[in-house]
Amino acid sequence: MLTIPQVVRAAAEFGDREALVAGDRRWTFRELVHEVERCARSFIALGLAPHDRVAVWAPNSPEWMFAALGAQMVGGVLVPINTRFKGAEAAYVIDRSGATFLFVANGFLDIDYSSEVSGHPAPSLVHVVDVTGPSWNDFVRAGEGVSSSVLAEREGAVRPDDLCDIIFTSGTTGRPKGVMSRHDQTIRVFREWSAIVGLDADDRYLIVNPFFHTFGYKAGFLACLLRGAAMLPLAVFDVPTVLRMVSTERISALPGPPTLYLSILNHPDRHAFDLSSLRLAVTGAAAVPVEMIRRMREELSFDVILTAYGLTESTGTITMCRQDDDPETISSTSGRAIDDIEVRVVDENNVEVPRGTAGEIVCRGYNVMPGYFADPVATADTIDDDGWLHTGDIGVMDTRGYVTITDRLKDMFIVGGFNAYPAEIENALLGHPAVAQVAVVGRLDERMGEVGHAFVVRRTGESVGSDELIEWARTRMANYKVPRGITFVESLPLNASGKVLKFELRERLR
Protein backbone atom coordinates (compact mmCIF):
# COMPACT_ATOMS: atom_id res chain seq x y z
CA MET A 1 0.00 0.00 0.00
CA LEU A 2 1.56 3.25 -1.16
CA THR A 3 -1.46 5.57 -1.45
CA ILE A 4 -4.29 6.50 0.89
CA PRO A 5 -6.89 5.14 -1.58
CA GLN A 6 -5.12 1.78 -1.30
CA VAL A 7 -5.21 2.01 2.51
CA VAL A 8 -8.95 2.71 2.46
CA ARG A 9 -9.60 -0.21 0.10
CA ALA A 10 -7.50 -2.53 2.27
CA ALA A 11 -9.43 -1.39 5.37
CA ALA A 12 -12.60 -2.76 3.78
CA GLU A 13 -11.08 -6.22 4.29
CA PHE A 14 -11.71 -5.81 8.03
CA GLY A 15 -15.34 -6.18 7.02
CA ASP A 16 -17.92 -6.15 9.80
CA ARG A 17 -15.50 -5.42 12.62
CA GLU A 18 -16.41 -2.22 14.42
CA ALA A 19 -14.44 0.65 12.92
CA LEU A 20 -15.85 3.90 14.23
CA VAL A 21 -17.93 5.05 17.20
CA ALA A 22 -19.29 8.56 17.76
CA GLY A 23 -21.98 8.89 20.41
CA ASP A 24 -24.77 6.48 19.49
CA ARG A 25 -23.54 6.16 15.89
CA ARG A 26 -21.47 3.13 14.92
CA TRP A 27 -19.88 1.99 11.67
CA THR A 28 -18.18 -1.21 10.59
CA PHE A 29 -15.12 -0.97 8.36
CA ARG A 30 -17.27 -1.87 5.38
CA GLU A 31 -19.72 0.91 6.25
CA LEU A 32 -16.92 3.41 6.86
CA VAL A 33 -15.45 2.75 3.41
CA HIS A 34 -18.93 3.22 1.91
CA GLU A 35 -19.21 6.66 3.56
CA VAL A 36 -15.78 7.62 2.22
CA GLU A 37 -16.82 6.47 -1.26
CA ARG A 38 -19.94 8.64 -1.12
CA CYS A 39 -17.81 11.69 -0.35
CA ALA A 40 -15.30 10.78 -3.06
CA ARG A 41 -18.10 10.61 -5.65
CA SER A 42 -19.44 13.97 -4.47
CA PHE A 43 -16.05 15.62 -4.86
CA ILE A 44 -15.93 14.37 -8.45
CA ALA A 45 -19.46 15.60 -9.14
CA LEU A 46 -18.72 19.03 -7.70
CA GLY A 47 -15.59 19.52 -9.79
CA LEU A 48 -12.67 18.72 -7.49
CA ALA A 49 -9.70 18.21 -9.79
CA PRO A 50 -6.60 16.17 -8.90
CA HIS A 51 -4.26 18.17 -6.64
CA ASP A 52 -7.01 20.67 -5.65
CA ARG A 53 -6.97 21.56 -1.98
CA VAL A 54 -9.75 20.73 0.49
CA ALA A 55 -9.72 22.53 3.86
CA VAL A 56 -11.38 21.13 6.99
CA TRP A 57 -11.95 23.52 9.91
CA ALA A 58 -13.87 21.36 12.34
CA PRO A 59 -13.43 19.27 15.49
CA ASN A 60 -12.85 15.52 15.50
CA SER A 61 -15.87 13.80 13.99
CA PRO A 62 -16.77 11.02 11.55
CA GLU A 63 -17.63 13.65 8.94
CA TRP A 64 -14.11 15.11 9.24
CA MET A 65 -12.70 11.70 8.37
CA PHE A 66 -15.17 10.98 5.58
CA ALA A 67 -14.53 14.33 3.89
CA ALA A 68 -10.75 14.14 4.26
CA LEU A 69 -10.41 10.57 3.04
CA GLY A 70 -12.99 11.13 0.31
CA ALA A 71 -10.94 14.01 -1.07
CA GLN A 72 -7.71 12.02 -0.89
CA MET A 73 -9.35 9.06 -2.66
CA VAL A 74 -9.74 11.15 -5.82
CA GLY A 75 -6.44 13.03 -5.69
CA GLY A 76 -7.45 15.98 -3.52
CA VAL A 77 -4.99 17.47 -1.04
CA LEU A 78 -6.20 17.80 2.55
CA VAL A 79 -5.60 21.11 4.39
CA PRO A 80 -6.51 20.73 8.08
CA ILE A 81 -7.16 23.95 10.01
CA ASN A 82 -6.77 24.40 13.76
CA THR A 83 -10.22 24.78 15.34
CA ARG A 84 -8.80 27.36 17.73
CA PHE A 85 -7.82 29.69 14.91
CA LYS A 86 -9.72 32.93 14.52
CA GLY A 87 -11.31 33.90 11.22
CA ALA A 88 -8.31 35.84 9.93
CA GLU A 89 -5.93 32.99 10.76
CA ALA A 90 -8.11 30.41 9.01
CA ALA A 91 -8.69 32.67 6.00
CA TYR A 92 -4.93 33.06 5.59
CA VAL A 93 -4.52 29.27 5.41
CA ILE A 94 -7.41 28.94 2.94
CA ASP A 95 -6.10 31.74 0.74
CA ARG A 96 -2.47 30.64 0.92
CA SER A 97 -3.31 27.04 0.04
CA GLY A 98 -5.83 27.99 -2.65
CA ALA A 99 -8.44 25.66 -1.14
CA THR A 100 -11.61 25.31 -3.22
CA PHE A 101 -13.63 23.40 -0.59
CA LEU A 102 -14.05 24.23 3.10
CA PHE A 103 -15.75 21.97 5.64
CA VAL A 104 -16.80 23.57 8.94
CA ALA A 105 -18.80 22.62 12.03
CA ASN A 106 -20.89 25.69 12.79
CA GLY A 107 -21.80 25.95 16.45
CA PHE A 108 -18.70 24.19 17.77
CA LEU A 109 -17.45 26.23 20.74
CA ASP A 110 -20.43 28.54 19.96
CA ILE A 111 -18.69 29.82 16.83
CA ASP A 112 -20.22 30.32 13.39
CA TYR A 113 -17.19 29.28 11.37
CA SER A 114 -18.79 30.11 8.02
CA SER A 115 -19.30 33.71 9.12
CA GLU A 116 -15.80 33.88 10.58
CA VAL A 117 -14.32 33.14 7.17
CA SER A 118 -16.77 35.17 5.10
CA GLY A 119 -15.41 38.42 6.53
CA HIS A 120 -11.94 37.76 5.09
CA PRO A 121 -10.71 37.35 1.51
CA ALA A 122 -10.46 33.76 0.26
CA PRO A 123 -10.99 34.07 -3.50
CA SER A 124 -10.22 30.42 -4.30
CA LEU A 125 -13.08 29.12 -2.16
CA VAL A 126 -16.04 27.71 -4.12
CA HIS A 127 -17.86 25.38 -1.72
CA VAL A 128 -18.46 25.74 2.03
CA VAL A 129 -20.07 22.73 3.70
CA ASP A 130 -21.31 22.65 7.31
CA VAL A 131 -20.88 19.06 8.50
CA THR A 132 -23.52 19.63 11.19
CA GLY A 133 -26.20 21.03 8.88
CA PRO A 134 -28.27 20.37 5.75
CA SER A 135 -25.39 21.29 3.45
CA TRP A 136 -23.61 18.08 4.53
CA ASN A 137 -26.54 15.97 3.35
CA ASP A 138 -26.62 17.95 0.11
CA PHE A 139 -22.91 17.33 -0.33
CA VAL A 140 -23.02 13.54 0.14
CA ARG A 141 -26.02 13.26 -2.20
CA ALA A 142 -24.30 15.26 -4.93
CA GLY A 143 -22.28 12.28 -6.13
CA GLU A 144 -25.06 9.72 -6.45
CA GLY A 145 -24.83 9.85 -10.24
CA VAL A 146 -21.06 9.22 -10.40
CA SER A 147 -20.36 5.69 -11.62
CA SER A 148 -18.06 3.17 -9.98
CA SER A 149 -15.86 3.15 -13.07
CA VAL A 150 -15.31 6.92 -12.89
CA LEU A 151 -14.47 6.63 -9.20
CA ALA A 152 -12.06 3.76 -9.85
CA GLU A 153 -10.34 5.73 -12.60
CA ARG A 154 -9.76 8.69 -10.28
CA GLU A 155 -8.51 6.43 -7.49
CA GLY A 156 -6.12 4.66 -9.82
CA ALA A 157 -4.67 7.97 -10.99
CA VAL A 158 -3.40 8.82 -7.48
CA ARG A 159 0.36 8.23 -7.39
CA PRO A 160 2.51 7.43 -4.33
CA ASP A 161 4.51 10.65 -4.76
CA ASP A 162 1.40 12.85 -5.03
CA LEU A 163 0.70 15.23 -2.17
CA CYS A 164 -1.86 13.94 0.31
CA ASP A 165 -1.95 16.96 2.62
CA ILE A 166 -0.60 20.39 3.46
CA ILE A 167 -0.50 21.04 7.20
CA PHE A 168 0.12 24.64 8.15
CA THR A 169 2.51 25.09 11.03
CA SER A 170 3.39 28.47 12.47
CA GLY A 171 6.97 29.59 12.26
CA THR A 172 9.44 32.11 13.56
CA THR A 173 8.56 34.47 10.71
CA GLY A 174 5.16 34.94 12.32
CA ARG A 175 3.15 33.51 9.41
CA PRO A 176 2.04 29.86 9.12
CA LYS A 177 3.89 27.79 6.52
CA GLY A 178 2.29 24.89 4.66
CA VAL A 179 4.16 21.62 5.19
CA MET A 180 3.62 19.31 2.21
CA SER A 181 3.42 15.55 2.65
CA ARG A 182 3.21 12.73 0.10
CA HIS A 183 1.04 9.62 0.20
CA ASP A 184 3.95 7.17 0.27
CA GLN A 185 5.91 8.83 3.07
CA THR A 186 2.81 9.26 5.22
CA ILE A 187 1.88 5.59 4.91
CA ARG A 188 5.43 4.35 5.43
CA VAL A 189 6.00 6.47 8.56
CA PHE A 190 2.75 5.46 10.22
CA ARG A 191 3.02 1.82 9.24
CA GLU A 192 6.34 1.95 11.13
CA TRP A 193 4.81 3.98 14.01
CA SER A 194 1.94 1.50 14.36
CA ALA A 195 4.29 -1.47 14.42
CA ILE A 196 6.54 0.07 17.07
CA VAL A 197 3.68 0.93 19.42
CA GLY A 198 1.99 -2.41 18.77
CA LEU A 199 -1.38 -1.09 17.63
CA ASP A 200 -3.54 -3.97 16.38
CA ALA A 201 -7.03 -4.92 15.26
CA ASP A 202 -8.16 -5.72 18.81
CA ASP A 203 -7.43 -2.19 20.01
CA ARG A 204 -10.06 0.45 20.67
CA TYR A 205 -8.40 3.85 20.26
CA LEU A 206 -9.84 6.96 21.92
CA ILE A 207 -8.58 9.78 19.69
CA VAL A 208 -8.37 12.87 21.89
CA ASN A 209 -5.64 14.50 19.81
CA PRO A 210 -7.17 16.86 17.23
CA PHE A 211 -7.42 15.72 13.63
CA PHE A 212 -5.88 19.00 12.46
CA HIS A 213 -2.65 17.79 14.08
CA THR A 214 -0.47 14.93 12.84
CA PHE A 215 -0.95 13.16 16.19
CA GLY A 216 -4.73 12.92 15.75
CA TYR A 217 -4.84 12.50 11.98
CA LYS A 218 -1.89 10.31 11.01
CA ALA A 219 -1.05 8.69 14.36
CA GLY A 220 -4.82 8.61 14.95
CA PHE A 221 -7.38 7.54 12.41
CA LEU A 222 -4.91 6.74 9.61
CA ALA A 223 -2.97 4.38 11.90
CA CYS A 224 -6.26 2.72 12.86
CA LEU A 225 -7.14 2.20 9.19
CA LEU A 226 -3.74 0.61 8.61
CA ARG A 227 -4.10 -1.79 11.56
CA GLY A 228 -7.85 -2.38 11.77
CA ALA A 229 -8.26 -0.78 15.21
CA ALA A 230 -11.58 0.76 16.24
CA MET A 231 -11.64 4.57 16.34
CA LEU A 232 -13.50 6.67 18.89
CA PRO A 233 -12.85 10.35 18.12
CA LEU A 234 -13.47 12.96 20.82
CA ALA A 235 -14.31 16.53 19.79
CA VAL A 236 -13.31 18.20 23.06
CA PHE A 237 -11.04 16.83 25.77
CA ASP A 238 -12.97 16.46 28.99
CA VAL A 239 -11.67 14.22 31.78
CA PRO A 240 -15.07 12.89 32.98
CA THR A 241 -15.98 12.04 29.38
CA VAL A 242 -12.65 10.27 28.85
CA LEU A 243 -13.08 8.26 32.06
CA ARG A 244 -16.62 7.27 31.12
CA MET A 245 -15.65 6.27 27.58
CA VAL A 246 -12.65 4.23 28.72
CA SER A 247 -14.94 2.34 31.07
CA THR A 248 -18.00 1.83 28.84
CA GLU A 249 -16.22 1.38 25.49
CA ARG A 250 -13.29 -0.63 26.89
CA ILE A 251 -10.67 1.72 25.45
CA SER A 252 -7.22 0.14 25.15
CA ALA A 253 -5.21 2.82 23.30
CA LEU A 254 -5.04 6.38 24.64
CA PRO A 255 -2.17 8.41 23.13
CA GLY A 256 -1.85 12.08 24.07
CA PRO A 257 0.31 14.80 25.63
CA PRO A 258 1.56 14.35 29.22
CA THR A 259 -1.15 16.75 30.46
CA LEU A 260 -3.77 14.18 29.42
CA TYR A 261 -2.46 11.52 31.79
CA LEU A 262 -1.83 13.97 34.63
CA SER A 263 -5.42 15.18 34.34
CA ILE A 264 -6.69 11.61 34.62
CA LEU A 265 -4.37 10.68 37.48
CA ASN A 266 -5.38 13.75 39.46
CA HIS A 267 -9.13 13.53 38.86
CA PRO A 268 -11.02 12.96 42.14
CA ASP A 269 -13.56 10.57 40.56
CA ARG A 270 -11.05 8.37 38.75
CA HIS A 271 -11.55 5.40 41.06
CA ALA A 272 -15.26 5.24 40.23
CA PHE A 273 -14.45 4.02 36.71
CA ASP A 274 -13.10 0.71 35.44
CA LEU A 275 -9.94 1.63 33.53
CA SER A 276 -8.51 -1.88 33.37
CA SER A 277 -8.84 -2.08 29.58
CA LEU A 278 -6.10 0.55 29.05
CA ARG A 279 -2.86 -0.87 27.69
CA LEU A 280 -1.17 1.58 25.27
CA ALA A 281 -0.01 5.17 25.81
CA VAL A 282 2.12 7.21 23.42
CA THR A 283 3.20 10.67 24.49
CA GLY A 284 5.72 13.41 23.91
CA ALA A 285 5.81 17.18 23.28
CA ALA A 286 6.92 17.84 26.86
CA ALA A 287 8.99 16.38 29.66
CA VAL A 288 7.59 13.15 31.10
CA PRO A 289 8.53 12.57 34.76
CA VAL A 290 9.53 8.99 35.57
CA GLU A 291 7.12 9.09 38.51
CA MET A 292 4.27 9.76 36.09
CA ILE A 293 5.24 6.71 34.03
CA ARG A 294 5.28 4.60 37.20
CA ARG A 295 1.82 5.85 38.20
CA MET A 296 0.45 5.29 34.69
CA ARG A 297 1.52 1.66 34.89
CA GLU A 298 0.44 1.03 38.48
CA GLU A 299 -2.71 3.15 38.68
CA LEU A 300 -3.98 3.27 35.08
CA SER A 301 -3.11 -0.27 33.93
CA PHE A 302 -0.93 0.78 30.96
CA ASP A 303 1.36 -2.03 29.80
CA VAL A 304 3.03 -0.06 27.00
CA ILE A 305 4.12 3.56 27.49
CA LEU A 306 6.27 5.16 24.80
CA THR A 307 7.63 8.64 24.17
CA ALA A 308 8.40 9.99 20.72
CA TYR A 309 9.73 13.08 18.97
CA GLY A 310 9.03 14.65 15.62
CA LEU A 311 7.68 17.70 13.85
CA THR A 312 5.21 18.30 11.09
CA GLU A 313 8.14 18.74 8.69
CA SER A 314 9.27 15.17 9.50
CA THR A 315 5.82 13.64 8.95
CA GLY A 316 5.36 13.83 12.69
CA THR A 317 8.01 11.28 13.60
CA ILE A 318 11.80 11.14 13.92
CA THR A 319 12.57 9.12 17.04
CA MET A 320 10.58 6.76 19.26
CA CYS A 321 11.19 4.73 22.37
CA ARG A 322 10.63 0.99 22.07
CA GLN A 323 8.42 -1.30 24.12
CA ASP A 324 11.35 -2.91 25.95
CA ASP A 325 12.88 0.40 27.07
CA ASP A 326 13.11 0.97 30.82
CA PRO A 327 11.10 3.74 32.55
CA GLU A 328 14.15 6.00 32.92
CA THR A 329 14.83 5.85 29.17
CA ILE A 330 11.18 6.55 28.37
CA SER A 331 11.13 9.45 30.81
CA SER A 332 14.46 11.07 29.99
CA THR A 333 14.69 10.56 26.22
CA SER A 334 12.53 10.76 23.11
CA GLY A 335 13.81 7.45 21.80
CA ARG A 336 15.97 6.53 18.83
CA ALA A 337 15.46 6.92 15.10
CA ILE A 338 12.74 4.92 13.41
CA ASP A 339 14.02 2.42 10.83
CA ASP A 340 15.81 3.79 7.76
CA ILE A 341 15.91 7.35 9.12
CA GLU A 342 19.22 9.07 9.84
CA VAL A 343 19.51 11.34 12.88
CA ARG A 344 22.53 13.41 13.84
CA VAL A 345 23.38 16.15 16.31
CA VAL A 346 25.44 18.94 14.73
CA ASP A 347 27.13 22.19 15.67
CA GLU A 348 26.60 25.63 14.12
CA ASN A 349 28.86 24.61 11.21
CA ASN A 350 26.74 21.52 10.49
CA VAL A 351 29.50 19.23 11.79
CA GLU A 352 28.39 16.22 13.82
CA VAL A 353 29.28 16.56 17.51
CA PRO A 354 30.43 13.75 19.83
CA ARG A 355 27.80 11.69 21.66
CA GLY A 356 26.69 13.42 24.83
CA THR A 357 27.35 16.90 23.39
CA ALA A 358 24.50 19.31 22.76
CA GLY A 359 23.76 20.50 19.24
CA GLU A 360 20.99 20.89 16.71
CA ILE A 361 19.04 17.75 15.81
CA VAL A 362 18.92 17.06 12.07
CA CYS A 363 17.39 14.13 10.23
CA ARG A 364 17.36 12.70 6.73
CA GLY A 365 15.16 10.07 5.13
CA TYR A 366 11.75 9.24 3.73
CA ASN A 367 10.02 11.14 6.54
CA VAL A 368 11.36 14.56 5.48
CA MET A 369 8.78 16.80 3.82
CA PRO A 370 9.10 17.70 0.13
CA GLY A 371 9.09 21.32 1.30
CA TYR A 372 6.90 24.22 2.30
CA PHE A 373 4.03 24.91 -0.08
CA ALA A 374 4.89 27.69 -2.54
CA ASP A 375 7.82 28.78 -0.37
CA PRO A 376 11.17 27.66 -1.81
CA VAL A 377 13.13 30.14 0.30
CA ALA A 378 11.80 28.77 3.59
CA THR A 379 12.31 25.24 2.29
CA ALA A 380 15.98 25.94 1.49
CA ASP A 381 16.42 27.45 4.95
CA THR A 382 15.13 24.24 6.56
CA ILE A 383 16.43 21.41 4.34
CA ASP A 384 20.09 21.67 3.34
CA ASP A 385 21.66 20.63 0.04
CA ASP A 386 22.41 17.16 1.39
CA GLY A 387 18.78 16.53 2.33
CA TRP A 388 19.12 17.05 6.08
CA LEU A 389 16.09 18.57 7.79
CA HIS A 390 17.22 21.11 10.39
CA THR A 391 14.72 20.84 13.22
CA GLY A 392 15.74 23.93 15.14
CA ASP A 393 15.71 21.83 18.31
CA ILE A 394 18.74 21.41 20.55
CA GLY A 395 19.39 17.95 21.89
CA VAL A 396 21.89 15.36 23.03
CA MET A 397 22.35 11.84 21.64
CA ASP A 398 23.65 9.12 23.93
CA THR A 399 25.85 6.17 22.96
CA ARG A 400 22.76 4.08 22.15
CA GLY A 401 21.46 6.68 19.69
CA TYR A 402 18.70 7.87 22.01
CA VAL A 403 17.91 11.57 21.81
CA THR A 404 17.06 13.98 24.61
CA ILE A 405 15.61 17.37 23.67
CA THR A 406 17.16 20.11 25.79
CA ASP A 407 16.13 23.41 24.18
CA ARG A 408 14.53 24.96 21.12
CA LEU A 409 16.48 27.10 18.73
CA LYS A 410 13.30 28.63 17.41
CA ASP A 411 11.98 29.69 20.84
CA MET A 412 8.82 27.67 20.38
CA PHE A 413 7.03 26.55 23.52
CA ILE A 414 4.34 23.90 23.94
CA VAL A 415 1.04 24.74 25.61
CA GLY A 416 -0.88 21.60 26.53
CA GLY A 417 0.41 19.81 23.44
CA PHE A 418 -0.01 22.78 21.06
CA ASN A 419 3.02 24.47 19.52
CA ALA A 420 3.11 28.21 20.25
CA TYR A 421 5.49 30.46 18.33
CA PRO A 422 6.57 33.76 19.91
CA ALA A 423 7.03 35.63 16.61
CA GLU A 424 3.44 34.96 15.60
CA ILE A 425 2.10 36.07 18.99
CA GLU A 426 4.35 39.13 19.01
CA ASN A 427 3.16 40.21 15.58
CA ALA A 428 -0.43 40.02 16.77
CA LEU A 429 0.22 41.96 19.99
CA LEU A 430 1.95 44.71 18.03
CA GLY A 431 -1.44 45.39 16.48
CA HIS A 432 -2.62 46.93 19.74
CA PRO A 433 -2.31 50.74 19.59
CA ALA A 434 -0.65 50.92 23.02
CA VAL A 435 2.09 48.36 22.30
CA ALA A 436 5.43 49.66 21.03
CA GLN A 437 7.60 46.58 21.52
CA VAL A 438 6.93 43.08 22.75
CA ALA A 439 8.82 39.85 23.37
CA VAL A 440 7.10 36.58 24.24
CA VAL A 441 8.73 33.64 26.00
CA GLY A 442 7.45 30.39 27.43
CA ARG A 443 7.35 29.77 31.15
CA LEU A 444 6.66 26.60 33.09
CA ASP A 445 3.08 25.90 34.09
CA GLU A 446 2.00 23.02 36.32
CA ARG A 447 -1.17 22.25 34.37
CA MET A 448 -0.29 23.11 30.75
CA GLY A 449 3.44 22.30 30.77
CA GLU A 450 4.28 25.74 29.40
CA VAL A 451 2.38 28.97 28.77
CA GLY A 452 3.29 32.26 27.14
CA HIS A 453 4.45 35.36 28.98
CA ALA A 454 4.79 38.72 27.23
CA PHE A 455 7.19 41.53 28.07
CA VAL A 456 5.67 44.73 26.73
CA VAL A 457 6.99 48.25 26.16
CA ARG A 458 4.08 50.71 25.98
CA ARG A 459 3.91 53.47 23.40
CA THR A 460 4.66 56.91 24.80
CA GLY A 461 1.51 58.50 26.13
CA GLU A 462 -0.51 55.29 25.81
CA SER A 463 -1.96 53.25 28.65
CA VAL A 464 -3.06 49.62 28.76
CA GLY A 465 -3.24 47.12 31.61
CA SER A 466 -2.39 43.42 31.69
CA ASP A 467 -5.97 42.18 31.88
CA GLU A 468 -7.09 44.50 29.10
CA LEU A 469 -4.30 43.41 26.77
CA ILE A 470 -4.88 39.72 27.49
CA GLU A 471 -8.60 40.08 26.77
CA TRP A 472 -7.79 41.96 23.57
CA ALA A 473 -5.49 39.10 22.53
CA ARG A 474 -8.19 36.48 23.20
CA THR A 475 -10.33 37.93 20.42
CA ARG A 476 -7.51 37.79 17.89
CA MET A 477 -5.65 34.52 18.36
CA ALA A 478 -6.18 30.92 19.37
CA ASN A 479 -6.48 30.57 23.14
CA TYR A 480 -3.30 28.53 23.55
CA LYS A 481 -1.33 31.41 22.01
CA VAL A 482 -2.71 34.05 24.41
CA PRO A 483 -0.08 35.06 27.01
CA ARG A 484 -1.08 34.05 30.53
CA GLY A 485 0.96 36.87 32.00
CA ILE A 486 2.27 40.28 30.97
CA THR A 487 5.14 42.28 32.40
CA PHE A 488 5.42 45.94 31.39
CA VAL A 489 9.01 47.13 31.01
CA GLU A 490 10.76 50.35 30.01
CA SER A 491 12.89 48.52 27.45
CA LEU A 492 13.75 45.03 26.23
CA PRO A 493 17.25 43.59 26.72
CA LEU A 494 19.09 43.58 23.38
CA ASN A 495 22.41 42.29 22.13
CA ALA A 496 24.83 44.30 19.99
CA SER A 497 22.92 43.51 16.80
CA GLY A 498 19.59 44.53 18.30
CA LYS A 499 18.21 41.04 18.90
CA VAL A 500 16.13 40.54 22.03
CA LEU A 501 17.97 38.48 24.64
CA LYS A 502 15.15 36.11 25.45
CA PHE A 503 17.22 34.02 27.81
CA GLU A 504 17.41 37.08 30.09
CA LEU A 505 13.63 37.39 30.00
CA ARG A 506 13.26 33.72 30.88
CA GLU A 507 15.61 34.21 33.80
CA ARG A 508 13.37 36.98 35.15
CA LEU A 509 10.52 34.47 35.36
CA ARG A 510 12.44 31.86 37.33
Q: What is each model feature region?
A:
Residues 85-91, 102-104, 254, 365, ...:
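AMP-binding/adenylate-forming catalytic core of the ANL superfamily
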Residues 16-69, 86-91, 137-144, 157, ...:
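Conserved AMP-binding/adenylate-forming core of the ANL superfamily
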Residues 28-30, 161-188:
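Conserved AMP-binding A3 loop
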Residues 45-46, 73-141, 460-462:
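Structural core segment of the AMP-binding/adenylate-forming
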Residues 336-340, 351-382, 418-420:
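Conserved ATP/PPi-binding loop(s) of AMP-dependent carboxylate-activating enzymes
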Residues 251-256, 267-329, 342:
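Gly/Ser/Thr-rich phosphate-binding loop
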Residues 75, 187-204, 212-253, 267:
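Conserved AMP-binding/adenylation subdomain of ANL enzymes
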Residues 16, 129-134, 144-168, 175, ...:
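Conserved pre-ATP/AMP-binding loop-to-beta segment of ANL
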